[in-house]
Amino acid sequence: MAWISLRIDARDDNAELLSDTLMELGALSASIEDANAETPDEQPIFGEPGDPPPGIWQQNVVTALLDESADLDSLLEELSAATGITDFRYSTETIAEQDWVRATQSQFEPIRIRDDLWIVPSWHDAPNPDGLNIVLDPGLAFGTGSHPTTHLCLSWLADTVKPDTSVLDYGCGSGILAIAARKLGAGKVVGVDIDAQAIQSSVYNADQNQVDASFYLASDLPGGQFDIVVANILSSALSVLAPALARAARSGGRIALSGILREQADQVSAIYQEWFEMDAPVFMDSWVLLTGSRR
């Protein structure tokens, strides 16, 4: 059996309409993606914590999966009639039957961060069994560790973590930074997130890596200060959380902030200068790592 993948260019004001209508017309699935994803023009969507979702991207691709027997011309006519959109720009691709689990796994290879620090999919042999290998299951939510901000934070941790230092990973997601800190020799390691599924993912991944770390929902986080605070989250959230992250860092402690675009770096850095002596920013592609020392 085969399928047809239909990709339609869409604006921010019609992408959801197209996606919903395609499902009503019998599509097996429909999704919306940033048309500029994984390019320098990628458009992150930011919103203040607690605010409603700010919307979708300005330029989108709506992808629908259709049965191979679908009459594409008739479908597009019905789609146009139902939405009032007549100027579709689209492309199609035939997708053959295959072992989807194996196909998905083949997309993820071990990622070398630096030296012998690796991110290794759980089903893959480690390129260096004696290296510092962080085992992740990319089938879980909260990322695979391939994003530039993850690279920036992991490389910084490798330079900064000393034996028995305490580390707070705020916005732990998959737990990758907390797990790395523990494997790099940190003592007390705590991860925190606002999403219960992130906590479950972090606990699972920590168990996979046989490391001892504690994970809490933000509302349940015990008090205390840390030698190192790292937060790889949205820049808007970093701005709001600055006082809390400053309280979590002991005097002389270190902080690392990412999830920040180049054009947002000055604004975020200025906020944290109230509590930290900020270092020169480090860049990777269009992303920034900000670090500093607690006064």
From Swiss-Prot:
What catalytic activity does the UniProt entry give for this protein?
A: L-lysyl-[protein] + 3 S-adenosyl-L-methionine = N(6),N(6),N(6)-trimethyl-L-lysyl-[protein] + 3 S-adenosyl-L-homocysteine + 3 H(+)
Listed EC numbers: 2.1.1.-
Give the GO terms filed under biological process for this record. Answer: methylation
Q: Which UniProt keywords apply?
A: Cytoplasm, Methyltransferase, S-adenosyl-L-methionine, Transferase
What InterPro entries would the database entry show?
Ribosomal_L11_MeTrfase_PrmA (IPR050078), Ribosomal_PrmA_MeTrfase (IPR004498), SAM-dependent_MTases_sf (IPR029063)
Subcellular localization, as worded in the UniProt entry: Cytoplasm
Uppermost EC category: transferase
What's the name of the protein? Ribosomal protein L11 methyltransferase
Source organism per UniProt: Methylobacillus flagellatus (strain ATCC 51484 / DSM 6875 / VKM B-1610 / KT)
What gene name does this entry carry?
prmA
